[in-house]
Amino acid sequence: MAMLASKSPFPAPLATSGSGMMAGTAQASYPPSRRAPAVPPASQSFSPTESEFSDSDDHDSPKHWDEDKVCEYLRSVRCGEYEKLFRKNHINGENLLEMDKDVLKEMGIEKVGDRVRLFLSIKKLRTKAIAGQKKRNRDSFAGHESMYTPVSESPSKPFHSSSRVMPNPSVNKRYSRQIDLSGMAYDPSRPTTSSRPTSPLPSADFRTARTRNPYVGQQPTPTGSLRGLGSPPDSQANSRPVLTHTRTDSGMDGSLMAALPQNQDVIRVISTGGVTKVVKIADCNTCEEVMRVTLRKFALREDHERNYCFWVLSGLDPDPKQCRRLGDTELWRVIKDQKRPERNRLILRRVPAGEPGQSELERAAAIAMEEAQQSHSRAMDNVGARSQIKVQKVLGENWDNLQPPLSPVLYQDRERNVYNAARDLERPEPLDSGRLQPRRKVLRSFGGLRPPSELIASDLTTYFPDHPREDIDRTARLSMRRSARLSKVNSRLSVASSFSMASSIQDAPPIPTIADSWLQSTPLPKARPRDLQSRLQHGYRDSVASSMLDTLQEEGSPIEPNRKSYVSFADSGSDSAAVSVTDPDGNIVRHSYFDEGSTIGSGSGSGSFGDVSKALNEDGEDADEDLQSFLSGESWDDSKWMKGALIGQGSFGCVYLALHAITGELLAVKQVEAPSPGANSQNDARKKSMIEALKREISLLRDLRHPNIVQYLGCGSSAEYLNIFLEYVPGGSVQTMLNSYGALPEPLVRSFVRQILNGLSYLHEREIIHRDIKGANILVDNKGTIKISDFGISKKIEATNLLNGANNNKHRPSLQGSVFWMAPEVVKQTSYTRKADIWSLGCLVVEMMTGTHPFPDCTQLQAIFKIGGGKATPTIPEDASTEAKAFLAQTFEMDHNKRPSADDLMLSPFLTPIT
């Protein structure tokens, strides 16, 4: 019999009763009251569906893309840098849809992040293409099935066949529904065939079509023959097209996870974000050893096994209520019993984090659903013939038509993509769509923390996605050129100077601008070798130039080292963005572009901003208006800096990475949305309060200069935002470290506490109370330097408050800060002194030693009553050293007058080992 090709076009309307010999014969064979359907000649065959199971795809389908279209797609997913690589390998749309991570790696895409992003984009593209073809399949099938109507008005009961024949392989590895119109004529030699479609989506469509028209897809009669159009009217079998299903293995089966290997001691563990790994536990004899092996597999600290636990999902839905934590006894039973399905989807969680997140639950549910599908398939394949007959009698349906359950992952992913695409297409375009801001890209972390400046400088386009590569490259290039130019100018000025650079810094009057002048730096010892010099002075900010420029070599003969000094940027091995200035005595002092309170030279000496600006005009090079504007203090309008990825956000606003367009210095900009003019809504009142808090923070920070306090650089405003520019601190907060690594070891706590006390001592000397010392507000850079941040609720001590004390109701202290870190006098609102920060410091030490806040068993309201009652103090960790317990006992003194100051605590034995 003639089977039709999958690409044959579907003919126009079928021939009339008078067109075609077969049709005429059929008409003559029946009484006038009945007439057979008009059928084209048997030599013409076609596919009625034109679905994803045939090769007749839409021309716009990704399968038909050429190399130019593929390159355009790469640019749309921010992978345009690999355009040449794809062209070199002649990748077209058909090749693109078949690519996976291994293929991308073999092509030469070295970055893991780019491979993952590109693979996920290709996967979504593949899913979208299949979903579109699936819709065309349904529409086409519904449009064509009406052409195959039954001969009789009353349908006959279908006969069932218990035979099961393996599906025939197809050449193009697709499903294909094909119709053999010659089968409508009587053919006694035609064999009895039946097939069981095992593809979830096609079979679902077929079942829907068969429900709408019971004559489509019925099985042949038990005699193995079909009565043709010439059969008598009382024929039991009606003429209909015969559908033949073919199937081979598909490369897009949607499988999520393979089953664990049999007879091997392994478990599958799901971690944060739905990441799964298979862990070998053959050599583990206790649950603690299992936990340590698991932590090692996920690159976590093994000595923190007590901070982690295992959870398991009981049902098939990602519902936290169906999730339970496993104790050691139950965990051991699960991992040792290879018949337990839970060992294939254990969830690893930190104990303080509580129940698993949504991503972990979804991954566990998907694995459980796939296990259920595989179990169903195995059960169906192992059923005997007698059992099949019983099932057919009970269900009233042919065994071969019983469909396996849909693949949950495949179905959910595809339906979700189809729904999202349809929703995006049907959504009306808003009137102010031109003003909508694109969704901000979150700063890509580095080991769970903020990336160092070297990493940002090596891939600026990733961290500044809203700016063209040309603008970013020009900024980096100009910043290096300007740094070299300033080095030459300051070198000439220092040679002409008759006094030491260090002394001029102290005598320099401040310039009344936001970025007034250079910061007065502590002179370092004599010049050291380059490898040692790079380790000094980590308390300066990062810049693109500091990561790209090598240190300029000192000019002049070694015989006359006092003849010259030079200015250069730190080498790439340091995070310093400061300018290194060597004075005639050989001392090195470093400055940054935005440091205030000092100048390079006094008003009449060399090195002041005025002298530098004058020297730039006389150095014979082209005028640089942007640099002159920067030297005059005009540094913070929107054209002078570039907004990068999102670092963090909170109730106050958002913090973004920023790049100064003149100097190439990396910054952090805190943005608060400005209230609408004349608006009095509750939201605008909240914005005004945040603006006031930000202004209060600016007024305090602009006068602070300390290596353990986040450096304020300047501020600016626009019609929509108020911006405050701070130094960029790579790394993260203490709270982030605790979330990532658990409790900190005591030697590290000692180091952090000493630096925090240095910063608090500096603040308290200037009558400033921070009022919110906690792990989230203490930053740790990638060199281990502490930075105290977030001065939004800090304030200066008023003399009237100190004199009148708690009896001054007009200036009654407000309840400011975080409840778990509050001192008793703050909760009672009796007084607010420097000693409140000391209590909060003790709570911070407990937080670092335990990994949780000081009152983990209390809600905020319960903690307020506990602390305000004056009888409860945070529990001191039992495993703390004697010195640490004594230190905490001093900080938790209930009477704030007896509580030691920051300077007194610096002499504590707890901090002695690191002095």
From Swiss-Prot:
Gene deletion effect: Produces much less aerial hyphae and conidia and shows weakened cell walls and higher sensitivity to cell wall-degrading enzymes. Impairs the formation of appressoria and the ability to infect rice plants.
UniProt cross-references to SMART domains, sorted A to Z: Ras_bdg_2, S_TKc, SAM
Disordered: region residues: 1-65, 134-171, 183-249
Pfam families: Pkinase, Ras_bdg_2, SAM_2
UniProt domain Ras-associating: residue ranges: 263-353
UniProt KW Transferase keyword: yes
Binding site for ATP: 647-655, 670
Protein kinase domain location: 641-911
Ranges of biased composition (kind: Low complexity): 26-45, 152-163, 188-203
Catalysed reaction equations from the record: L-seryl-[protein] + ATP = O-phospho-L-seryl-[protein] + ADP + H(+); L-threonyl-[protein] + ATP = O-phospho-L-threonyl-[protein] + ADP + H(+)
EC number: 2.7.11.24
Its job: Mitogen-activated protein kinase kinase kinase; part of the MST11-MST7-PMK1 MAP kinase (MAPK) cascade that is essential for appressorium formation, penetration and invasive growth. The MST11-MST7-PMK1 MAP kinase cascade transduces signals from the cell surface sensors MDB2 and SHO1 that recognize various surface signals such as surface hydrophobicity, cutin monomers, and rice leaf waxes. MST11 acts as the upstream MAPKKK that directly phosphorylates MAPKK MST7. MST11 but not MST7 may also be involved in the OSM1 MAPK pathway in response to osmotic stresses.
Domain notes: The N-terminal sterile alpha motif (SAM) domain, but not the Ras-associating (RA) domain, is essential for the function.
Quaternary structure (record): Interacts with the adapter protein MST50.
Protein name, UniProt field: Mitogen-activated protein kinase kinae kinase MST11
Species in which this protein is naturally found: Pyricularia oryzae (strain 70-15 / ATCC MYA-4617 / FGSC 8958) (Rice blast fungus)
Gene assigned in the entry: MST11
